[in-house]
């Protein structure tokens, strides 16, 4: 009989403990806030219909423990520990079903990392034009560089590269440096700071020489010392024209004719060369040179001033008081020129206009 009583008490105690465990599980499932997505168990959902949630992952694991009551033996602490561990495992497996988890989070971080790498590569490509074109200062001073092989500056002259410059690099003066005496760019400035920095622009050879024509009086300019401004007579001889031949014929006639025949003015050889271009101004002659060693010559073929179209006066009306022919003949025949003396008029001879006036008064 004693054994029967003991077995009865044992069954009552076991039922009490199981009921207590189930009550604790019901309270824990009410406080569970996990997301939906877990399948519903048809066998265990009828036990506690008022306290269970359809899509809770922890409810499935908790109710599955009811099939094996020996697993949840007399201690409540042993029951809570495996339930918590199984819930964590289910949450890890079903994390993609949780609404609070974003699947694009890791992917966006990976894309951001790739973009940063591409930007770094692009930055290295932008600076590739100046890569290894200057010496590394820390390497020159201490012989070591913290960047090592990744340094963008040259570690020695064997790594130094030549930089491609603009065609006008160091060919013009730096306005800022020569105005205020300071340039913020320093040695990297593309303009000239000192005379030794000047370099000749590629393709710019000698400048073309300027060709200057003779002056209006026929004299070449002998004060030009620069080779860029040399006269064209030193490069090519002047072309022979009809006016120059005419000037030479005039000089030959002067050597053969009488110096005193039909001449109103007398010139020396040096002065004849000055007046000859003026005499044939209408034919635009070049400069006719007469050697200074020749004796004084007379310039017979000089035309009268009245015959030259340059010096022709406008026709005067018939009632004018001036007699042009008599005036010119009288004024030209009375003057003489020797050396640098100016022509003088005869004081005893009156001008024709004054003689006309005196006759009209009488």
UniProtKB/Swiss-Prot annotation:
One of its GO terms (cellular component) is ribonucleoprotein complex. Residues 111-120, 327-346 have a biased composition (Low complexity). Residues 147-188 are annotated as: RNA-binding. Residues 100-126, 225-244, 306-362 are annotated as: Disordered. GO terms for molecular function: mRNA 3'-UTR AU-rich region binding; zinc ion binding. InterPro entries: Tis11B_N, ZFP36-like, Znf_CCCH, Znf_CCCH_sf. Residues 100-109 have a biased composition (Basic and acidic residues). It holds the Pfam family Tis11B_N. Phosphorylated. Keywords: Cytoplasm, Developmental protein, Metal-binding, Nucleus, Repeat, Ribonucleoprotein, RNA-binding, Zinc, Zinc-finger. A zinc finger (C3H1-type) spans 130-158, 168-196. A motif (RNA-binding) lies at residues 130-135. This is mRNA decay activator protein ZFP36L2.
């Amino acid at each position: 009989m004693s054994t029967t009583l003991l077995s009865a008490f044992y069954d009552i105690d076991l039922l009490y403990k199981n009921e207590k465990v189930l009550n604790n599980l019901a309270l824990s499932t009410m406080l569970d806030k996990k997301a939906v997505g877990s399948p519903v168990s048809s066998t265990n959902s009828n036990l506690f219909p008022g306290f269970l949630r359809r899509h809770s992952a922890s409810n499935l694991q908790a109710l599955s423990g009811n099939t094996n009551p020996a697993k949840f033996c007399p201690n409540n602490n042993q029951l809570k520990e495996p339930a918590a561990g199984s819930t964590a495992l289910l949450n890890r497996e079903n994390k993609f079903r949780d609404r609070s988890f974003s699947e694009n989070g890791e992917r966006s971080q990976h894309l951001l990392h790739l973009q940063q790498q591409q930007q770094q590569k692009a930055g290295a490509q932008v600076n590739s034009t100046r890569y290894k074109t200057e010496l590394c200062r820390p390497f020159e001073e201490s012989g070591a560089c913290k960047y090592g092989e990744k340094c963008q500056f040259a570690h020695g002259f064997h790594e130094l590269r030549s930089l491609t410059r603009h065609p006008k690099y160091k060919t013009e003066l730096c306005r800022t440096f020569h105005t205020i005496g300071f340039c913020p760019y320093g040695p990297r400035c593309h303009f000239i700071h000192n005379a030794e920095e000047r370099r000749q622009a590629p393709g710019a050879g000698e400048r073309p020489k300027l060709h200057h024509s003779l002056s209006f009086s026929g004299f070449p300019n002998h004060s030009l010392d620069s080779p860029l401004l040399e006269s064209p007579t030193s490069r090519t001889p002047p072309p022979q024209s009809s006016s120059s031949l005419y000037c030479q014929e005039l000089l030959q006639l002067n050597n053969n004719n009488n110096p005193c025949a039909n001449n109103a003015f007398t010139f020396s050889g040096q002065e004849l060369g000055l007046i000859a271009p003026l005499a044939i101004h209408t034919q635009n002659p070049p400069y006719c040179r007469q050697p200074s060693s020749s004796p004084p010559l007379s310039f017979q073929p000089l035309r009268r001033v009245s015959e030259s179209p340059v010096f022709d006066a406008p026709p005067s009306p018939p009632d004018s008081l001036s007699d042009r022919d008599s005036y010119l003949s009288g004024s030209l025949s009375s003057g003489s020129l020797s050396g640098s003396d100016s022509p003088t008029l005869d004081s005893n001879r009156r001008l024709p206009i004054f003689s006309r006036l005196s006759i009209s008064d009488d």
